[in-house]
Design a protein with these regions (language model features):
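Conserved nucleotide-sensing/catalytic segment adjacent to the nucleotide-binding pocket
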Residues: 1-58
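ATP-dependent NMP and nucleoside kinases share a basic, alpha-helical "lid"
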Residues: 45-95
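Small-molecule kinase domains that catalyze NTP-dependent phosphoryl transfer to phosphate-bearing small molecules
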Residues: 45, 67, 96-133
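Generic structural signal for short, solvent-exposed loop/turn connectors between secondary structure elements
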Residues: 9-12, 64, 68-72, 132-133
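A generic structural signal for well-ordered coil/turn residues at beta-strand boundaries
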Residues: 35, 54, 74, 125-126
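Structural signal for conserved beta-strand scaffold positions within catalytic alpha/beta enzyme cores
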Residues: 3, 79, 131-132
Length: 133
């Protein structure tokens, strides 16, 4: 089941951490073949299954992985310290450049989710590495 990323969630539960952990993080860590699905914003659903790359390093960009349930599955976590207003402006500009009109989602869902998550879980403190921009 895919959880929608367009709803309020103080723990970023919509990112489907359980699926990401079981189908991506753990198989990669143990060297097992697996597949993953990208979220396709044009249809607002998971895309087709793709083979998980067999690499030494796998980078996943997702604040919701700083959740206590997911952190044990990460070898290294990096927090890029950018203020939320700047990050939101950049994200909205990126989305507009891609033809995605997500301003309302940013304003009404994603920014409040980020604030709630940061307050509740202090991801910058949980990070192995903190990058100050």
């Amino acid at each position: 089941m895919v959880r929608l990323l367009d709803r309020r969630s103080g723990d970023w539960g919509g990112v489907d951490r359980e699926r990401l952990t079981s189908s991506v993080l753990e198989p990669h860590r143990t060297g097992r073949a697996s597949t993953f699905q990208r979220f396709d914003w044009s249809v607002r659903a998971l895309g087709p299954a793709e083979p998980l790359p067999q690499t030494d390093v796998l980078i996943v960009d997702l604040i919701g992985l700083f959740h206590p349930d997911a952190l044990p599955h990460l070898d290294v976590s990096i927090w890029c310290d950018v203020d939320l207003d700047t990050a939101a402006r950049r994200g909205m500009a990126r989305d507009r450049a891609l033809g995605r009109r997500h301003d309302a989602l940013w304003r009404d869902v994603w920014i409040p989710n980020e604030r709630d998550f940061e307050e509740r879980y202090a991801p910058e403190d949980a990070a192995s590495v903190r990058y100050l921009a």
